[in-house]
């Protein structure tokens, strides 16, 4: 048991006396973030509703994100806000953070691109399930809901099976 818990302390808050003097430093400009979210939303929805339209346009988004991250100052400190987001905002944020980490690890451009593509597609199967998953704790879900949620990985894989442009 960690020392803090043994003292009966359940949570800790750190006050930053300089917080009011700092400006938020997002990974990318909020307008660019919103543009990415809208592109991801449009692509995922058109794939669902238009008989399997190719997801190849994710290549362009992946390249744009890698380019935007590469253009950032190298030693920038990024603020990450806790917030509720939808599937599309989550997808873009995971992609941005992952490419940022890949850059810090000095991975080559091809690996950063593959990471971006994987992140953009990592939850595509959630578009095919019928159970509610947003803001949900599945530790107390009934077996049928848990089974339905877990299907998103298989459904996502199946949705990508015909996409020949994705690296093996």
Question: What residue spans do the PLM features occupy?
Answer:
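N-terminal accessory interaction module
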Residues: 1-15
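Acidic/His-rich, divalent-metal-binding segments that scaffold phosphate/diphosphate chemistry
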Residues: 17-150, 154-164, 168
């Amino acid at each position: 048991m960690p020392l803090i818990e043994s003292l009966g302390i359940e949570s800790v808050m750190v006050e930053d006396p300089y917080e009011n003097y700092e400006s938020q430093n997002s990974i990318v400009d909020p307008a660019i973030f919103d543009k990415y979210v809208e592109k991801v939303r449009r692509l995922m929805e058109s794939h669902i509703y238009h008989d399997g339209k190719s997801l190849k346009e994710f290549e362009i988004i992946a390249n744009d994100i890698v380019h935007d991250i590469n253009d950032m100052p190298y030693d920038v400190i990024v603020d990450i806000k806790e917030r509720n987001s939808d599937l599309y905002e989550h997808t873009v944020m995971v992609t941005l953070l992952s490419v940022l980490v890949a850059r810090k690890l000095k991975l080559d451009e091809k690996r950063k691109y593959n990471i971006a593509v994987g992140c953009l597609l990592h939850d595509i199967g959630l578009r095919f399930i019928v159970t509610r998953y947003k803001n949900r704790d599945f530790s107390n879900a009934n077996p049928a809901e848990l089974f339905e949620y877990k299907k998103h990985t298989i459904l996502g894989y199946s949705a990508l099976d015909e996409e020949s442009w994705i690296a093996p």
